[in-house]
Amino acid sequence: MSTSIPDVAVHDSPAVAAPLRWVGMDGIVVPVQLTTADGGQHVIGRARAQIDLPAMEVKGIHMSRLYRLLDTHAVEPLTPVGICGLLSAMVNSHADCASTAARVDWHFDWLRRVPALVSNDLSGWRGYPVSLRAEYSAVHVQFWLCVEVGYSSTCPCSAALARQMLADAFLQEHVEVSALSPETVADWLRSNGSYATPHSQRSVARIEVALTEQAVELGLPALVDCAERILSTPVQAAVRRVDEQAFARLNGANLMYVEDATRRLQHGLAIHYSAFRVHVRHLESLHPHDAVASTVDE
């Protein structure tokens, strides 16, 4: 009985000789260590790890090598500085495949405790979907951090239509009244202010920013704070009625189409980030489809 274990990837030849741009694994379950000014955090994520395969005569790469490298790196905080070493090691591990490029993507949810808008003693958890893409080659190293920020958007057109209907209803009911006290008007508004309401919806801004390879942290709190400050109506966690009332006021003060939200982000992000991509989606409550807009500044 033979004691040698066959290695088809090494000893067999491909049926069709051709270079491959990327080869590797996707959906790898990995622990992710995050370090921020808010403190450290351990979350569960999924990763994709790939290298190029320029050697046409090589049947396949050694995926177990990539897995072990990714597993070893998982004990370190996720930072561009540390990832550079991982990418370089991935390429070096496949010198027998003539590999010159590597890339890894991570996907996970970043958890953050956020305070209520008004209630000082109330807070709750928010989860932000995050992805980090790192790509290494002989000519460049690129890092893109992406986060999804949820917020509320109220349609400006719908708000104008609702105001008109409310005004018309008020005039129709008081057409023969020459003078009204402020208290009477206030009572009427309390009873009839919802005669027509504008449509609003949960919305999502997907924001990607470029990171430098020297960065020692991802900068998630700063990016999320920047986006939520620009949009002004981030979705909330724990609320009381006073917080919900404050949220309604913010929505009324920040009416926006999908175009408005995208332009706001474009203007505000340009102050802090040299390269970014924005994709905005409003999950319309009026329509069965979404409104979308995007912009790029690279």
UniProtKB/Swiss-Prot annotation:
What is the reaction catalyzed?
GTP + H2O = 7,8-dihydroneopterin 3'-triphosphate + formate + H(+)
Q: Where is this site: May be catalytically important?
A: 155
Record-level GO BP terms = tetrahydrofolate biosynthetic process
Q: Does the keyword Hydrolase apply?
A: yes
Annotated metabolic or biological route of this protein: Cofactor biosynthesis; 7,8-dihydroneopterin triphosphate biosynthesis; 7,8-dihydroneopterin triphosphate from GTP: step 1/1
Keywords of the record, alphabetical order, are: Hydrolase
Q: What does this protein do?
A: Converts GTP to 7,8-dihydroneopterin triphosphate.
NCBIfam families xref list: PRK13674.1-1
Q: What is this protein called?
A: GTP cyclohydrolase FolE2
Which organism does this record belong to? Xylella fastidiosa (strain 9a5c)
Lineage, uppermost ranks:
Bacteria, Pseudomonadati, Pseudomonadota, Gammaproteobacteria, Lysobacterales
What gene is this protein a product of? folE2
